[in-house]
C-alpha cells in the first residue's frame, strides 16, 4: 500500500471540501496516454493500488506506466463501539486529494485499443469519473 515514509503531522486537518481545478499535474508529461480525473474526490491508497495492478496487467512487459497521484493525507478514525469525544482518532488510512483535471495514471508503449481497455478497467476501480487523454 502507498503511504508516506514520514510526515510532519500525524493527524492533519480534514478540509471540508475540495475547491477548484488542478493547477499542477494536469497535462500528460511522461507517457502517450493518461487517465484524467473529472470530479473532485479523495482517492484511497487501496483504490490507487487496485487501478495500478489492472493497468500493469494490461501493460505486461511491452508498456510503461506512471502513477501520478500519491496518498499523502492521513484519515483518522475512532475504534468501533467507542463513545463520542476523547480527542481525535488514530490514523486509519491514507488518501490522495484529487481535483478535476488531474492526471492519475500515464502509459506508454501500448496500442490505443489496449490502452482504452486498461484505462476503462482502472477507472472502474476508482470512485471518480475519468476520461482517457492523449499527449497530442
From Swiss-Prot:
Binds 23S rRNA and is also seen to make contacts with the A and possibly P site tRNAs. Keywords: Ribonucleoprotein, Ribosomal protein, RNA-binding, rRNA-binding, tRNA-binding. One of its GO terms (biological process) is translation. SUPFAM superfamilies: Ribosomal protein L16p/L10e. It comes from the Bacteria. Gene3D superfamilies: Ribosomal protein L10e/L16. One of its GO terms (cellular component) is cytosolic large ribosomal subunit. It comes from Elusimicrobium minutum (strain Pei191). GO terms for molecular function: rRNA binding; structural constituent of ribosome; tRNA binding. Belongs to the universal ribosomal protein uL16 family. PROSITE patterns: RIBOSOMAL_L16_2. The gene is rplP. This is Large ribosomal subunit protein uL16. InterPro entries: Ribosomal_uL16, Ribosomal_uL16_bact-type, Ribosomal_uL16_CS, Ribosomal_uL16_dom, Ribosomal_uL16_sf. PANTHER family: 50S/60S RIBOSOMAL PROTEIN L16, LARGE RIBOSOMAL SUBUNIT PROTEIN UL16M. Part of the 50S ribosomal subunit.
Amino acid at each position: 500500500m502507498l503511504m508516506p515514509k514520514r510526515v510532519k503531522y500525524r493527524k492533519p486537518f480534514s478540509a471540508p471540501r475540495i475547491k477548484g481545478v488542478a493547477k499542477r499535474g494536469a497535462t500528460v508529461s511522461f507517457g502517450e496516454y493518461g487517465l484524467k480525473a473529472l470530479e473532485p474526490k479523495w482517492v484511497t491508497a487501496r483504490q490507487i493500488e487496485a487501478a495500478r495492478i489492472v493497468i500493469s496487467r494490461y501493460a505486461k512487459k511491452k508498456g510503461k506506466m506512471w502513477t501520478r497521484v500519491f496518498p499523502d493525507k492521513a484519515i483518522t478514525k475512532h475504534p468501533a463501539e467507542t463513545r463520542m469525544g476523547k480527542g481525535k482518532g488514530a490514523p486509519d488510512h491514507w488518501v490522495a486529494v484529487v481535483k478535476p483535471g488531474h492526471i492519475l495514471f500515464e502509459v506508454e508503449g501500448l496500442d490505443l485499443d489496449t490502452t482504452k481497455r486498461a484505462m476503462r478497467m482502472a477507472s472502474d476501480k476508482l470512485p471518480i469519473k475519468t476520461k482517457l487523454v492523449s499527449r497530442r
